[in-house]
Amino acid sequence: MNMKLSEIKNGNLSAEWAEKGYELPKFDIEAVKAKTHAEPTWVHFGAGNIFRAFPAAILNDALNTGKYDRGVIVAESFDYEIIDKAYRPYDNMSLLVCLKSTGEIEKKVVASVTESLKADYSFGEDWARLVEIFQNPSLQMISFTITEKGYSVAPADLERGLTPVLAMGKVTALLYERFKAGKLPLTVQSMDNCSHNGDKVKNAVHTYAAKWVEQGLVPAEFLAYVQDETKITFPWSMIDKITPRPDAKVQKMLADDGFEDNYTIVTEKHTFTAPFVNAEETQYLCIEDHYTNGRPPLELGGVLYCSRETVDKIEKMKVCTCLNPLHTAMSIYGCMLGYTLISAEMADEDLRAFIQKIGYIEAMPVVVDPGVLNPYEFIGAVINRRLPNPFMPDAPQRIATDTSQKLAIRFGETIKAYEARGLDKSNLILIPLVLAGYARYLKGIDDNGQAFEPSTDPLLAELQAIVAPLEVKEGEQDFSCLKKLYSRVDVFGVDLYAVGLGEKIESMAKELFAGPGAVRKTLHKYTLAR
């Protein structure tokens, strides 16, 4: 018997699915599809792996409870090949492979996506269907996973009138169709991993609408409509889940099971996709509960609805304390110690102790506690399940990208919080060690004395020029150039000398530069002492 996604629709299922641990939909797929076609409630823009692994899977879980009866319609506005190659041949179904830190995997067929559409005027039928959906009073929410770049507005696109090519322009054009259908209410929901994401969508939509009014293409009432929060809202959200490219190890496991849809697809635009999607087990989606026309009950699948202030606190907890600072510490030292996998770093006793103590001892005293998520449970999941996960092929080199843009929020905010609360900054030892490590990292020489290429960064050449006089060697040398680095408020969020940490960091940097092996020796010394 074939184990193919197309067989599920037919209901002609072999016992092999259950025997091999595949969880199948518990709802009537065709009934949900018909109901959604007639009365759509949710359109999602961005057909990539994160959508299938998270929002679509959450809705699948909600449908499995029997308490909801509508699916989600996916629209792709950038890489149309995804629709042709990863959705339609499989009746819009996919296999979610959940990768656990224990090495176990869970396999679940996701059948909550009822239609897949190419969001562009050149695809006449698809665009007409999107217009029809946006004109339907039943539509409650549109959402996005299109990356932060997807919310950009280009001057040239604003001059294209009502047929723009960028995602936000197309969405604004569809909102105009909804406006013409009777100024119908709708919630416009970003689910991308960037702070205050709702404002990014709002600003883009308002920019297009204002320009079109100025050009005389739409009435002024349209701008008033998208600015009226009784009609259109742009809630904030915090999303957190790692969804890597389709993994060869997972592909082999599925092939060994007899699951036939196990190949990977690379589009002309270099999107890596497949009929299956592999992702980590841990996931968080917290959404500001500000809807104008109702919403799908995604809490049935684990979404946390809360206030805007709480979403902001959750974001700060993650970015300033419980995840991102640990990532950056591991990336700087991982690159210098020759690691290429974050999971491998977690088997290094010095590095594991380093990030544990940064999180629990130094950052946690000033953590922003959102109340609805426990910071200790969150960081515990990061250290014990997420970072050691052997299925997550994340590299310190990837995380080290744009480090100069990240240090202020990931460490500067903690230092500022110590200042604001009058806490003793002499208790900060390992956070200064991270910042001292940054000067050593900028040299591009690893702990064995071999050259490595630091990750791309807009300030890389400028900051490397500051540390250029320094050498990785034993003996005396002039470290006065570091003053120019560690007084950079734009990089660190504070003048580290003004807050009394500059000299401590300089002293640590001197130890890190003291020849091959000095990085390991210094890391071990301070981590053990802490």
Report residues per predicted region:
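Substrate/ligand-engaging "lid" and interaction regions
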Residues: N2-F45, N49-R530
